[in-house]
Amino acid sequence: MIMHTTSEVIDFARRLENGSAKFYEDLSAQYATGVDILLSFVKENKKNVVQIERAYYGVISDAIEGCFAFNVESDDYALATSIAPGTIHADALNRAVDMEKTIVKFYLDAAEQAGPLMADVPRAFKMVAGKRDDRERKLRLLLTGKST
């Protein structure tokens, strides 16, 4: 589905955050390694939703919403957020790394498209992308058996 309006993109961002939070909750329930880190990602996801919604509701108007600021294909950022029973821990963590890359790409692409029309929403997207980008490092440390 191609998203054109800010509200569509915000709603999709919310779904990415909530879906990936569920993935990390499930991952922490299945494996003993890195539980604290994974649950911290869940909390951060909830904060990300609040941050994005604040930026959106703080600047949105009918004039901005009426124009089509985006041309984002949601299928390009689709996530598989379920973990099959018996999945090897390293495979699940590698999937988490891929998921983070996809979500960061979404936020950076959306920020770039929205930049000319509004400042606060792209700034929030870039901030969330930066936080999520750091997760890749933490996940890779978990893969090597090191603590963050």
Regions found by a protein language model. Name each.
Residues S20, D26-L27, D76-P116:
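Acidic/histidine-rich alpha-helical segments that form the ligand environment
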Residues A13-Y24, L38-Y56, E100-I103, F125-L139:
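Alpha-helical transition-metal enzyme core signature, strongest for iron centers
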Residues D26-D36, Q113-D120, K146:
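Inter-helical turn/loop segments and adjacent helix faces that build the functional surface
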Residues M3-T6, I10, L38, G86-H89, ...:
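Amphipathic alpha-helical coiled-coil segments and their boundaries
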Residues M1-D26, Q30:
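The feature marks the first
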